């Protein structure tokens, strides 16, 4: 991506985020923090981040949202945190303990990690099951379309590959996603998490 293309992407993101700022903040404030940082500090981010944010906002305008599932994923990872008057965050309850330098501890997701989880879990689409209305009972996630077919509300993102730089808790986040699918996710889900050292 050339510098000119990055500037065009930045201008486009600035424009679309201004229209969707309230919608994004209502989903999760850290999602808004990440997207706003892309706009205010574009030199700290690469062009693919800008394009990914533009695409996410377009998908958010186009498809159904499943904020409940997204918030469940975030809660199971980190639990509930509270910010003190001094600005420090303290863990209150819930969430999983993760391996840390001083033993098992709770971690709060960073804004870019919240964006990753939102892209995976927040968007849903109506999919034609190729069954006609009346051919069977409807499941709780289904409805009858205007064409007389049964449609099911499913996650839009069904395949996801995460590439991030070193020291961004990618192995920990990937392992958590596997855990979430095992405990709460779709049946027959397949998740693969690779690390380059056995102690990870």
Which residues does each PLM region occupy?
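Phosphate/NTP-binding elements of NTP-utilizing enzymes
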Residues: 1-200
């Amino acid at each position: 991506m050339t510098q000119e293309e990055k500037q065009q992407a930045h201008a486009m993101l600035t424009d679309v985020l201004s229209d969707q700022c309230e919608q994004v903040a209502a989903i999760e404030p850290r999602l808004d923090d990440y997207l706003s940082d892309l706009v205010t500090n574009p030199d700290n981010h690469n062009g693919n981040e800008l394009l990914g944010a533009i695409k996410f906002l377009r998908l958010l305008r186009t498809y159904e949202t499943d904020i409940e599932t997204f918030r469940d994923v975030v809660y199971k990872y980190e639990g509930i945190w509270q910010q003190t008057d001094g600005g420090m965050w303290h863990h209150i309850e819930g969430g999983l303990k993760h391996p840390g330098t001083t033993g098992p501890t709770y971690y709060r997701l960073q804004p870019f990690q919240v964006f990753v989880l939102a892209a995976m879990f927040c968007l849903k689409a109506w999919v034609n099951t190729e069954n006609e209305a009346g051919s069977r009972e409807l499941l709780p996630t289904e409805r009858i379309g205007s064409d007389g077919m049964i449609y099911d509300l499913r996650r839009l993102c069904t395949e996801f590959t995460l590439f991030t730089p070193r020291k961004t808790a990618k192995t920990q986040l990937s392992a958590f996603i596997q855990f979430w699918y095992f405990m709460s996710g779709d049946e027959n889900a397949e998740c693969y998490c690779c690390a380059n050292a056995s102690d990870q």
